[in-house]
């Protein structure tokens, strides 16, 4: 697409970053100044009743700056990147029609990628095929299935850990249904995003600082009632660790504690470690992201001013 045709597209802003980097605070600050409406880009914030452990914006923050695509699913329900793209495009169109600019804020990089580049035409899940794969795993083990994937799709096998049954079974399922590998199909992208996007990533300058923030925030969550929040989910009886909601960082570790599998101290340790690993993955993804403007979260006023400088021309 030429620069001229790009310039004629409606505007949008991406504010990306690792967990605990200050994205929400900056987005709320920007909403006071720019004609923007916020859309959450977070695979954990979509769930109702999961507020403390996801660091969901509180009632006061949401009053000052409403976020779309929060609390749109029960924890028992699944939500895919395709679901997000459909919902986000609808919200963006609504915001643009009102003469305002969509500001998409969050840390689920897969959602940002799906929105920006479109989705490859992967086949829908097939319960029968999935059941056969799981039966084979029960009989032979996931290591055996991982070796099978190495023969079928070595690129996907290199990316997927043998202890990640969800992604492993999906890669095999795609091949068994379509006859094409996951790698082959994902190289065929869908429709690009019909917006002129200004992309920002916010993070602390030092990894140690981010690690400190993550640990502090995890302890703040515990002090704010995180255990009680997960106990309420646990008591429902219909939720389990195979669900994406309960696999969210922090929730999975607390769940293991409530099931008596690990001690409280071990839960805290694992929760902090898992959150740090998530942040590392998010930063790794962002480092390979093209056209992103980096912001230092330790200098919030400077970060705000840099965004205003870049997008100020579109605010009129």
Curated annotation (Swiss-Prot):
Protein's GO biological process: tRNA modification
Protein name, per record: tRNA dimethylallyltransferase
One Pfam family cited in the UniProt record for this chain: IPPT
Transmembrane feature ranges: none
Gene: miaA
Entry keyword set: ATP-binding, Magnesium, Nucleotide-binding, Transferase, tRNA processing
Documented EC number(s): 2.5.1.75
Keyword Secreted: no
Domain of life: Bacteria
